[in-house]
Each structure stands twice: as structure tokens, then as C-alpha cells.
Amino acid sequence: MKYINKLEEWLGGTLFIAIFGILIAQILSRQVFHSPLIWSEELAKLLFVYVGMLGISVAVRKQEHVFIDFLTNLMPEKIRKFTNTFVQLLVFVCIFLFIHFGIRTFNDASFPIDALGGISEKWIFAALPVIAILMMFRFIQAQTINFKTGKSYLPATFFIISAVILFAILFFAPDWFKVLRISNYIKLGSSSVYIALLVWLIIMFIGVPVGWSLFIATLLYFSMTRWNVVNAATEKLVYSLDSFPLLAVPFYILTGILMNTGGITERIFNFAKSLLGHYTGGMGHVNIGASLLFSGMSGSALADAGGLGQLEIKAMRDAGYDDDICGGITAASCIIGPLVPPSIAMIIYGVIANESIAKLFIAGFIPGVLITLALMAMNYRIAKKRGYPRTPKATREQLCSSFKQSFWAILTPLLIIGGIFSGLFSPTESAIVAAAYSIIIGKFVYKELTLKTLFNSCIEAMAITGVVALMIMTVTFFGDMIAREQVAMRVADVFVAVADSPLTVLVMINALLLFLGMFIDALALQFLVLPMLIPIAMQFNIDLIFFGVMTTLNMMIGILTPPMGMALFVVARVGNMSVSTVTKGVLPFLIPVFVTLVLITIFPQIITFVPNLLIP
């Protein structure tokens, strides 16, 4: 059983390394041998579909898919248990339908993939039914634990019997499923989309993972309207992962993990300490400065909070800082990561908005520096008021030593940005280069990265990618409903009726995102609202590069605000303190962040000037 439980990890980790090798070969072949590989990109995308699906399966087993537990935490224990049982039933249905639609799309697939020697696209679509079967097995495993721990009323046996019955119907009497088509009994017309959206909101807020709730709502819509097109729509579940720009996401995740396991984060922190530690509020400045340096390598807020957080909090405690300020600065400074290039959030926005990822990377730099300076100003004020001590000023020898030790790590953002603008590699390939560079300095320079740790890091990155992959798949599916019913245009009409200028629209969007960010995870929020907000921005002639940075900052504020502020929970965990302590500490640091948001909203040129200058 131990080996079966590790199946996804071993297979996914191996495929992850295979993609890594293929893309390294692609870069070397083009830049060194001047002979581009025509098959590398297509093969990497094909393998990524499998890696993403395997990651979803791992997240199903570990029950790590993004969900909202704000309401369920307020419920009495018995009602919470009943609600969780209902949620698990819905997830079970989703996984079965993944298998069902996966088989149908696999059977219908017939086109060749020319770049891979004409092999059938069935190889892509096979990922959905094959790995969904593995998901079902993992789901039943998880239900065994849920039942034993009193989280569900239904034993795993119930789901096993139900699965057998449903598979028997699927293979021997598939027409029976036609009874589920609501349109056979009642015509709901244009109200169908509103019913689907209402159901989506209800089931999402009672704890159904966001990805699965999108899938259920969209299927409900199709059952009420156009079931005949559902097959074509479900193809998008797989094709959504067949994207070269998205390949950057898992490898920036891997880079962040390697920074922690390869001894890089500690050296970054020590360099920041030697530079800033002797000023008033020194260790707070070190915390913020280290986050700025780390953000140029990982592109993730939570990677910063989890990776540097423990180190930063310990150093601040040792220097005499109160726990609330230790946690507050650590949480607030982690939002610099998604603004300063490289940025996973910017990559996802670029894919959704079909905008230049390179321009988005450049556009986020100035706001990232502004937030850094604003946080330092607030830290200075608090340190002055509370009388926090300063560390002794580093000697020239200490400064040179810390710089020498961190030099190779500090080169990472320069390598990424320089490579993109010189044309040596694309933004996607920059993630591969960043990961490769992290391996080299972790293994051969700092000598703290082992082959076993490297493989385990690939597995961890694959598992995190699975959470993102489910969101990408189902939000693309959901987007088909939004497009068919022109929901985005209807929302835009409301904005047009209320707003009289682009600035008014931006204020309304900021207010909406700030409110939603209190309850919805930043990643989920990005996938859920951007497809509806981007058309509004276009209608008001708002620059989409500016819009991407503004919405990214807004969503990062969401990870700092209760009750769903993920950074608060991560920092509380790594700092061994309560969430309320972190929340208390982060409140004063929200002021400079809000001021920065207001500034860039009123003066979008702060964001657009540099990218327009460098990339006309």
C-alpha cells in the first residue's frame, strides 16, 4: 500500500523532471547549437497535462484543493459534519463525471499532433479518464479517514458501492443518464445562467472546493440549456492545460522550493541584515528587504511567507520585537513577491488576458519597490514608537562576506529579466532557467541540495501545481458558460450605467476585489473574476498591463485580510503564534499598502511608463 500511495508522486516527479530536461534541451539547442527542436514544446505541453492531472489526484488524497470554510467554521459541529458529508458527495460526483466525460472525449479524439510525428491527440485526452480513475481511488481513501475521524456520516463502503453502480450504468446503460437533463422537463431560458451562478455561490461557500464548484455550476447550466454542446465544452478541460505559458507556473514554484532547500534563503536574509540591520527598526527592514530580494526569485507571496518567514520571525524575536510586529511585517512584506518579477500571478493574468508577460513583469517592479519603501516607513514609525533596538552596524568585512555568500543568489532576478529582454529565452523558459540555476548553486556552490531533496522538491512542486491545474481546468469550463450567456458584457453594462469615467470604474473594481478578497483565496479570485473584469476594462479603454498590476496588488491585499487571509495562516503556522496575533500586527501595515493602491489607481503612469518605454 505504501508504494501505491506514492504512485502519483513518483510518476509525477519523474514527468516533472522529464519536462525540465526537454525544455533545457530546447534552450540549449536553439541558443548553443542554433538548431531549434520542433517537437520539444508540444511534448512538454503533453507531459504537463499529465503532471497537472496527477497533481490534482495528490491534492484529492490530501484534501488540499482550495475551499472556503468561513461559513462552515461558524456552524455547530453536527451541522458542519452533515455539510461536509454533502460536500464529499458532490466531489464524488465531480470525479465520476471527469471519468465519464474523459472517456467520451477520448473516444471522439482523432486529430494528429504534427509536431510529435503525427501521434493521435488521444494521448492528450487519455489523461482525463485514466487519472480521474486514480482520483476516485484517492477520494475513497480520503473518505476512509474522514469517516474514522468523524468528519463525515458516510463510510468509504458507500462510495465504493455507488462507484460500482455508476460505472455499470455508464458501460451497460448510458442512456439512463439522460434523465439528468433538466431541459427535458422544463425550459428555463435566460434564467438558467442565474440559477447556475446562485448554485455555484451557495455550494462554494459551504465548503465545496472552488474548482469543483465551478464544474458543478457549469454542468448544471448545460443540463438546463444546451446539453448537446457539453462534449465540445469538456474538451476545454484538457486543452486548458495544453498551454506553453502555463509551464512557467510549476517551475517558478519549484524555484521557490529550491531556494529554501538549497540554503539560498538564509544567505539572502544574512545579506539584507548586514545592509539594513543597524537602522531604526533594523530587523523589520531586514525582513522587508529580504522579501524584496526573495521575490525576484520565487514569484510567490506564500513561498516568501513560508520560506523566509520562520527565519525572519526568529531573528526579530531574538532582537526583542513583539510577536504581533514579527508576524505583521512578515505577512505584509510577502505580498511584494507577486509584484516584482518574476511573478506567478502575472503569468496567470497574462494567460487569461492574452497580454505580454514580459511587459507585466516590468510593470510590477516600480509598485513593488514603492510598497517596499512604504512598509519600511511604517516599520520605522512603529520601531521608533516602541523603542525596538538596532543591531550593530556590519563591518566592511562582514558586509563583503555576506555579499559574497549571497552573490550567486542575488544574480537570479538579473538572469531572469536579462534573459527575457535579450531574447535568450521566453518568460516560460525563464522559469526553467531559474530552476536550473537554483539547482546549480544549491548543489555545487552552497552544497546543501541533495539529489533526494531535488526529487522531493519536484514532487512538492507537482502537488502544488495540481491545485492550480484544477482551477485552470474548471474556470475555463466555467468561462464557456460565461461567454455563451455574455455575462461579462451584462456586468459591463451595469458598470457603464453607474460609472461616468475610467477612474470611477477602477474605484468600483477595487472596492469589489477588496471585499471579495476577504472571503475568497487570491488564486481562486484571480480565475473567477478576471474573465469578467477584463472586458469591462477594455470597454473603458483601461490599459490591460496597468489593470493586471492593479488587480494583482488588490488580490494580494486579500491574503492579508481576515477571515480568509492565507498569509495570516501561513505566518501563524511557521511563527508558532495565533492568527489573531498576526492579524493585529498586520493592520498598521495595510495603511501603506492601501496608499500605494490609491496612488497607482489615480496615476496609472507609475505602472505603464517603464514597460511602454522598454517594449513599445
Swiss-Prot record:
Chain positions covered by the region annotation TRAP transporter small permease: 1-190
Subcellular localization, as worded in the UniProt entry: Cell inner membrane
Coiled-coil regions, chain positions: none
Ranges for region TRAP transporter large permease: 191-616
Signal sequence extent: none
Record field: transmembrane: 9-29, 36-56, 83-103, 117-137, 153-173, 195-215, 244-264, 288-308, 332-352, 357-377, 407-427, 431-451, 459-479, 505-525, 527-547, 552-572, 587-607
Topology of this chain in the membrane: Multi-pass membrane protein
Principal location class: membrane
GO CC annotation: plasma membrane
Domain of life: Bacteria
GO molecular function: transmembrane transporter activity
Key words, A-Z: Cell inner membrane, Cell membrane, Membrane, Sugar transport, Transmembrane, Transmembrane helix, Transport
Family per similarity comment: In the N-terminal section; belongs to the TRAP transporter small permease family. In the C-terminal section; belongs to the TRAP transporter large permease family.
Function: Part of the tripartite ATP-independent periplasmic (TRAP) transport system SiaPT involved in the uptake of sialic acid.
Complex formation: The complex comprises the extracytoplasmic solute receptor protein SiaP, and the fused transmembrane protein SiaT.
Name of the protein described by the UniProt record: Sialic acid TRAP transporter permease protein SiaT
